[in-house]
Amino acid sequence: MSTSLSYRDAGVGIDAGDQLVEKIKPFAKRTMRPEVLGDLGGFGALVEIGKKYQNPVLVSGTDGVGTKLKLAFDWDKHDTVGIDLVAMSVNDILVQGAEPLFFLDYFACGKLDVPRATDVIKGIAQGCEESGCALIGGETAEMPGMYPVGEYDLAGFAVGVVEKENVITGLSIGAGDVVLGLASNGAHSNGYSLIRKIIERDNPDLDAEFDNGKTLREAVIAPTRLYVKPILAALEKFTIKGMAHITGGGITENVPRVLPKNTVAQIDAESWELPKLFQWLQKAGNVETQEMYRTFNCGIGMVVIVAAEDADAVRSFLSGQGETVYRLGCIRERQGNEHQTQVA
């Protein structure tokens, strides 16, 4: 008679999954909003739309962290990639004026390492807490043979809400409007395949002091900045015509996503100083300037477009919220089929 097999024999530890759920419950609980009905662990999560909305529109977004995870594996640094995961989605839905309501995560691995997964999800909860977004659930998938030992993949899903009349579409953007840029916290979560290639080729001392007391390793792995609270506060006071979250495609490819087809964002390359991380990447990788602008955020994580008469006040307000804000340039009429972002 053959030996009796269990799920554990096949490589799946149900007890480990249960242990993880118990460990992360306190972190998730800190993120809860009054709109959330019920506790973590049900088959579905219930969220009601607040009564303050007359005609609410739900805005959804999903994203991952990309190959930045490879550095997390190599450097055994797992406590901030969860922040990256949240930021990539909530910053995206913020662009349309949405207040993030809730977030779900997907964590997949070959064998569940409970302490490591706890670090990751603790970071997710921190990102949710910092953006006022409830972590209402997720999926932990342990799939033997699907991932190398010690590796995992992440996906995040955010849903927010905005009053229909307040949805930011970019349609009102016109010549003469001002382009503001909010500083990034590093490379955020994009361009890491190139970053890893540069590190591999240049073989730098990752633990030597690099910038303002930070090592190069710390500068490279720094988490994506969350812009939710300062931008939502600004929207209470000012009209923002358009925003662009600077992610994959860099400055040149993301700004046009919010511009009317007959306009161009004319950006002055000298309006902000390229942060040291990007200076190093460009030099060590011999990366052409235009390639830098279409691969990395180059120090600008969020672009905000406002009327000229509001520019100084918005800049001052966001600075007061703790953001470093640059006046990058202006919107002008487009000539023929020229690219809609011109950096010069």
Curated annotation (Swiss-Prot):
A GO term for molecular function: phosphoribosylamine-glycine ligase activity
Localization, UniProt: Cytoplasm
Lipid metabolism keyword on record: no
Keyword set, alphabetical order: ATP-binding, Cytoplasm, Ligase, Nucleotide-binding, Purine biosynthesis
An annotated GO BP: 'de novo' IMP biosynthetic process
SUPFAM superfamilies: PurM C-terminal domain-like, PurM N-terminal domain-like
Gene3D superfamilies in the cross-refs: PurM-like C-terminal domain, PurM-like, N-terminal domain
GO cellular component: cytosol
Reaction catalysed by this enzyme: 2-formamido-N(1)-(5-O-phospho-beta-D-ribosyl)acetamidine + ATP = 5-amino-1-(5-phospho-beta-D-ribosyl)imidazole + ADP + phosphate + H(+)
Signal sequence region: none
Pathway(s) annotated for this protein in UniProt: Purine metabolism; IMP biosynthesis via de novo pathway; 5-amino-1-(5-phospho-D-ribosyl)imidazole from N(2)-formyl-N(1)-(5-phospho-D-ribosyl)glycinamide: step 2/2
EC number(s) from the headed UniProt entry: 6.3.3.1
One Pfam family linked to the record: AIRS_C
Family to which the UniProt record says this protein belongs: Belongs to the AIR synthase family.
Protein name: Phosphoribosylformylglycinamidine cyclo-ligase
Source organism of this protein record: Neisseria gonorrhoeae (strain ATCC 700825 / FA 1090)
Underlying gene: purM
